[in-house]
């Protein structure tokens, strides 16, 4: 008796399927607050990250990393990371009042879910229910012109975890607050996400490197 079915050993592996809620997943964005830049408070009010340097960024040993203003300090706490004008990047350490300096040679745009995972602008996403390193395709992101002029192909990679949201949500790393302000008008709050081994592209330009104090 003949059969058209392929032998089990030769069949292509089945792709892991996403939960059905990913057909209408929540899509948010996060960025690195930079000292001196415009940003916003937890309530959505516009602020500029400057002012009297009344707060001290310290490491877990009590050593001073930098003096900053109140707004900058609070944004660094809220986002868990921050960029100083002098090019130093800090990340929250053991608690909300201690910071560590990020090794920018290894992770120039910040840390992901682990110390050896670096974030990549407009590629990295945070998720609470997808595996780190997994790539997914976001339909509504495909073809979007990014603030730096490059066009996105819809492919993103899970490099981070989120502590403030639930499952079936992607938090998109857009690097800059100004990029967020532009993209929030283009990308909807709910998107269609498909599990796919897609190719992530680089969207970093010389202008982006200059903003990140990497030039």
Question: Which role does the model predict for each range below?
Answer:
Residues 11-215:
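Solvent-exposed, well-ordered loop and adjacent helix/strand elements within mature globular domains
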Residues 1-13:
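Fungal secretory targeting signals
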């Amino acid at each position: 008796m003949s059969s058209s079915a392929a032998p089990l050993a030769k069949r292509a592996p089945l792709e892991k399927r996403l939960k059905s809620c990913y057909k209408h997943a929540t899509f948010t964005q996060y960025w690195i607050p930079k000292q001196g830049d415009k940003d916003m408070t937890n309530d959505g009010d516009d602020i500029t990250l400057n002012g009297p340097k009344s707060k001290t960024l310290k490491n877990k040993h009590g050593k001073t990393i930098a003096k900053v203003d109140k707004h900058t300090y609070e944004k660094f706490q809220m986002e868990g990371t921050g960029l100083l004008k002098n090019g130093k990047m800090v990340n929250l350490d053991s608690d909300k009042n201690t910071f560590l300096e990020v090794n920018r040679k290894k992770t120039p745009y910040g840390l992901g879910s682990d110390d050896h995972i670096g974030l990549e602008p407009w590629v990295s996403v945070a998720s609470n229910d997808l595996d780190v390193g997994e790539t997914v395709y976001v339909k509504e992101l495909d073809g979007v012109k990014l603030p730096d002029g490059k066009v996105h192909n819809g492919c993103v990679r899970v490099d981070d975890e989120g502590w403030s949201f639930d499952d079936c949500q992607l938090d998109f790393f857009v690097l800059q607050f100004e990029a967020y302000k532009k993209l929030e008008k283009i990308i909807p709050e709910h998107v269609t996400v498909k599990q796919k081994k897609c190719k992530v592209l680089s969207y970093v330009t010389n202008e982006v490197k200059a903003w990140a104090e990497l030039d």
